[in-house]
Each structure stands twice: as structure tokens, then as C-alpha cells.
Regions:
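Hydrophobic alpha-helical connector segments
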Residues: 1-27, 77-84
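Residues in soluble alpha-helical coiled-coils and helical-bundle/repeat scaffolds
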Residues: 2-5, 38, 42
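Hydrophobic core segments within long, regular secondary-structure runs in both alpha-
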Residues: 11-15, 55, 107-115
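Amphipathic alpha-helical packing segments from all-alpha helical-bundle domains
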Residues: 22-31, 41-68, 79, 105-109
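Hydrophobic/aromatic-rich alpha-helical bundle segments in the mid-to-C-terminal region
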Residues: 44, 65-137
Length: 138
């Protein structure tokens, strides 16, 4: 991230890196805590302040990077940030037991398209870099 100057490329990169960070040991550990807290009220009560702070810090980071790129921190941008985080979290967890590259490609393409649609709406179509259509495979 530090090698990419502020702007749309950095914003695109942080969104694309979400899946990578979810698959890192620290990301997987956080996911395991999230999953464990669903059925254990004591764990949930113990980790909720920390997990909430991590989530809020992430939203602030992405919002700052988005603002540096000229984007407005609207509800749509926050919704996209949450969607990317939740989708890549689920993808990181699920691909350990269902390692289908096609699922990952489909999800990544959809998230990138949503991101570029937001960029086009806020900054104009000339700023968007939509991914090429996915090749249909049998």
C-alpha cells in the first residue's frame, strides 16, 4: 500500500487486498473469533469491543483512502466497504473447504464492478476502469 501514491489506484488496491488480508493468519484468527462468538455469549461479550474497534478502524482507513482519491464517504461507499469486507471474509473461510477458483473470480469481478460503478457515479465514467467481462466457461 505504501508504494502506491494516494488516489484511485490506492483505493482500488485496498479493496482488492481485502481477500488477501482475510486469508493471512491474523485475518483467519479474527474470523475464527467471529465464528466462535456466534454461539458463545461470554466470548461475544469479551471480544465485541475489540472487534468493533477493528471494524471501525478499517472503515475509517478505507474512507480516508477514498477521500484522498476524491470520493465522498457516502452511505454507498460505506456499504461497498462493508460488502467487500464481508464477501472476502466469507470467501476466505469457504475456499478452505471449497477451493473453487471460479467462485473467487466471480466474486472478485462482481466486487470490482461495484467499485468501478461507484467511481463512475461519483467522479465520472472516464475515471472508472471496469474489469473485462468474465469468460463464460462450461
Amino acid at each position: 500500500m505504501a508504494k502506491v501514491p494516494p488516489g484511485l489506484d490506492r483505493y482500488r488496491l485496498i479493496m482488492d487486498l481485502s481477500f488477501v488480508t482475510q486469508r493471512m493468519p491474523a485475518g483467519m484468527a479474527l474470523n475464527e473469533i467471529r465464528i466462535g462468538s456466534r454461539s458463545d455469549p461470554e466470548i461475544r461479550d469479551a471480544v465485541m469491543p475489540m472487534m468493533s474497534a477493528i471494524s471501525e478502524d478499517y472503515v475509517r482507513l478505507v474512507s480516508r483512502i477514498a477521500c484522498e482519491a476524491g470520493l465522498k464517504p457516502t452511505r454507498e461507499l460505506h456499504g461497498l466497504t462493508g460488502t467487500v469486507a464481508m464477501a472476502t471474509r466469507a470467501l476466505a473461510i469457504n475456499t478452505f473447504t471449497y477451493p473453487s477458483p471460479r467462485v473467487g473470480e466471480n466474486v472478485a469481478w462482481t466486487l470490482q464492478t461495484m467499485r468501478e460503478d461507484l467511481i463512475a457515479r461519483q467522479l465520472g465514467p472516464n475515471k472508472a476502469r471496469h474489469p473485462p467481462p468474465l469468460a463464460e466457461k462450461d
